[in-house]
């Protein structure tokens, strides 16, 4: 019986050792560091200047939508690049699979576009105002 690890076994051992190394460093640092919080340490630091306002700033949700779309297409490139390097060996069926993969992502982009998530300046909705009722008793009578 062969005692060596398979190709995936090497990857799993490397991954496990990486996780143990990072977790060990994190736990060691957490146990050795002093933890004495005070208001001065918890305050916002702005290069020696007095802090103006809060450090908590609300970001517009559109930034996150654009970042999410970028990440989706960035991951698409990560998946398609290895496919492109071995395209001749995989044949036409792999081309069809890659086109379906890209098509699904393009459909998602088209959906976001139609929904208006890619519009940076959105039009304000035109909400009709309700007509005002004449002043009188609550039951509507004027007498």
UniProtKB/Swiss-Prot annotation:
Membrane topology category: Multi-pass membrane protein
Cellular compartments per GO CC: NADH dehydrogenase complex; plasma membrane
Cell inner membrane keyword on record: yes
Main subcellular location: membrane
Coiled-coil portions: none
InterPro entries linked to this entry: NAD(P)H_OxRDtase_bac/plastid (IPR023043), NADH_UbQ/plastoQ_OxRdtase_su3 (IPR000440), NDAH_ubi_oxred_su3_sf (IPR038430)
GO MF entries: NADH dehydrogenase (ubiquinone) activity; NADH:ubiquinone reductase (non-electrogenic) activity; quinone binding
Origin: domain of life: Bacteria
Transmembrane segments: 7-27, 63-83, 93-113
Catalytic activity: a quinone + NADH + 5 H(+)(in) = a quinol + NAD(+) + 4 H(+)(out)
Localization in the cell: Cell inner membrane
Keywords for this protein: Cell inner membrane, Cell membrane, Membrane, NAD, Quinone, Translocase, Transmembrane, Transmembrane helix, Transport
Pfam families the record matches: Oxidored_q4
UniProt-listed Enzyme Commission number(s): 7.1.1.-
Enzyme class: translocase
Function: NDH-1 shuttles electrons from NADH, via FMN and iron-sulfur (Fe-S) centers, to quinones in the respiratory chain. The immediate electron acceptor for the enzyme in this species is believed to be a menaquinone. Couples the redox reaction to proton translocation (for every two electrons transferred, four hydrogen ions are translocated across the cytoplasmic membrane), and thus conserves the redox energy in a proton gradient.
HAMAP family attached to this UniProt entry: NDH1_NuoA
Family of this protein: Belongs to the complex I subunit 3 family.
Subunit composition and interactions: NDH-1 is composed of 14 different subunits. Subunits NuoA, H, J, K, L, M, N constitute the membrane sector of the complex.
Protein name per its UniProtKB record: NADH-quinone oxidoreductase subunit A
């Amino acid at each position: 019986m062969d005692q060596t690890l398979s190709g995936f076994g090497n990857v799993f051992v490397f991954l496990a050792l990486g996780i143990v190394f990072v977790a060990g460093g994190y736990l060691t640092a957490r146990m050795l560091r002093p933890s004495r919080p005070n208001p001065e340490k918890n305050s916002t630091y702005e290069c020696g200047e007095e802090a103006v306002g809060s450090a908590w700033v609300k970001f517009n949700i559109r930034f996150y939508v654009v970042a999410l779309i970028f990440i989706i297409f960035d991951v698409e490139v990560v998946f398609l690049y290895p496919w492109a390097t071995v395209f001749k060996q995989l044949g036409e069926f792999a081309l069809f699979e890659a086109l379906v993969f890209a098509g699904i992502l393009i459909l998602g982009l088209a959906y976001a576009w139609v929904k208006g998530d890619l519009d940076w300046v959105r039009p304000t909705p035109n909400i009709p105002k309700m007509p005002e009722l004449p002043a009188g008793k609550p039951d509507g009578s004027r007498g």
